[in-house]
Amino acid sequence: FFADLIDELKKAERYIFIEFFIVEPCQILDKLLQILSKKAKEGVDVRILFDSIGSVALSSAMESDYFKSFGIQSKIWLKFIPVFNTGLNNRDHRKIISIDGKVSYTGGVNITDEYANIYSKRFAYWKDAGIKITGPASRTFTLMFLEMWNVQNKKDVPCENFENFIPKEAQLCLENHTGKGKAGLVIPYGDDAYNGADIGENVYRYILQNATKNVSIMTPYVIIDGSMMDTLIFAASRGVNVELIVPQYYDHFISFCVGRTYIKNLIENGVKVYAYQSGFIHSKVFIADNKMGTVGSINLDYRSFYHHFECGTFLYRTKSIKEAQKDFDKTKLECKEITVENYKKIPWYVRTTGWIFRIFGPLM
């Protein structure tokens, strides 16, 4: 992911827009800054937007001075104020890189050495998923970034004209598009924490409801409401082979324990769940029938569905679907199935903690 990203950053001519939940001082950030600084000197418009909670390691002083010293504009999403407010839960969990409106990236990756498998105190390997989008579809990620960037403007600063950032060839493609041909579909989408549309959840639900043979899912968390639980179980009851890969080891203990209680409900009702043994799995991937799916930043939990700003890419009959399925199948070889019988062997304190804190599931 990062090697390909670095190659594309070097080709940027007009702008580089970067939006992440977690950005922290690290080796991979240093590598990126070397390139971004050079591009900024060449006149490329370089901007970074990051979340104040996820990127707590970047202080406000670094936000205003550190990136500025590299010629990079930066903004913090919802600066953290240590008092209760209703917006505290609405974090910018998106992962977006848009280069000239022609190449974009999204997925589960953040900008830390752990995600790049350079260094980790906790896990032998960090398994994640990202996707590269080229062509007219990339413009959507440009627009998503600009929306979030301009929301952070001061009241006296007017909103930018977004059309100025859409490549002319993309505009031409839109005007001449006939809807004909055998090419697959690539549809980027964003989920807004404020509008109640729950797009991320509905994309997952659409895939489950329209699958006829199999659904392959990779997710780090499983903390879901009754409606999503019913959708997963109903797909299995229709004869669809529904398989989930989840972590064997936790990054957040309480979320891990609570997630295991939901997994119990799933495996008791025909959904197959596998625990990844080789490290930590952070991928957010849904694939159905080897023909449709999605890759993005959206976890299978309440926070991603209802509280966070998220993004992803819906795919239909594209080459990347088959590649994602192959990756799932390969990853499953490094897993152990969680059956009803071996669920009982989960330590009592994990199961007890899960049931105690499950009441707080809607906040997780």
Q: What is the predicted function of each stretch?
A:
Residues F1-M364:
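Charged, low-complexity intrinsically disordered terminal segments
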